[in-house]
Amino acid sequence: MGYMVKLIYTQCKNCGYEWVVDQTIYYMKKYHDMVLTKTYFKPARFYVGDCNTIFNIAYDGIAWCDTPNNIVTKPSNSLKVITTSIWLKEHMEKKGIYVEQVIPRGINDEMAKKHVNFDFNARRGYVIIARNLPYKRIDNTLKMFEGKRKELTLISDHSNADFDFFSLSEDVKYYLLSHALFYIAVSDAEGFSIPPVEAMSVGTPLIYIKKHTYKEYGCGIEMDSIEDLRKIEISKEEWEDLSYKCWYKSLRYHYITVGQELWDWFK
């Protein structure tokens, strides 16, 4: 198969969307021998970003977008829209926006394979990866760990973070995810949140709040409110069962699968 060069746009530098673009470039080359070129400028063939932003700047091509916010902008008739979750697809369709396909964000296959860990005894505590934004509810989570802060590993740009969100390597991030008993997922809104699925990919179950945010991909222990964190109890056998189930569910989000779906749009 010959090289096929396409421009793929990221709406920002040093952000989650650029991470998605970089992962897509790497894995499309690895699995499909397809060369994609990152750009910060339009026009492009393929746009990655927040739906409201992309709909305002892209007039044709393909938008692979998500958003934690209400959709307030409509795309041009020439722009084909791919989104990252069934919930977002349904939300857009209610706004009169046609969605071509649902393709979730992919995880880092290589790191997941390297760090997958089903050993209950090699794990302790809880982990969360989140930007310091109100809807991420970091302060609420920290409050639940008052008096037992050492049990929580917080990866964030929050002032009380254990590791900085922006400087942590992929290798260290996946190592930390694979040595926690649970990943805490309590955000009020997401387009498609990658870190919880990254946790699942190394065998770490989620403790997640009962919201549309996690309905589609959540795996682990569902709770009604963040206060229920205080009530979590689980045996070794129950945890091991959840660990395997969550790992298995995460396979749908590996780039070997996601990339095959994207290939049809890049070819």
Swiss-Prot record:
UniProt enzyme class: transferase
Keyword Kinase: no
UniProt KW Metal-binding keyword: no
Keywords for this protein: Glycosyltransferase, Transferase
Superkingdom, natural source: Viruses
EC code: 2.4.-.-
An MF annotation (GO) of this entry: glycosyltransferase activity
Homology family: Belongs to the glycosyltransferase group 1 family. Glycosyltransferase 4 subfamily.
Protein's name according to its UniProt entry: Putative glycosyltransferase 63
Species this protein is from: Sulfolobus islandicus filamentous virus (isolate Iceland/Hveragerdi) (SIFV)
GN (gene name): SIFV0063
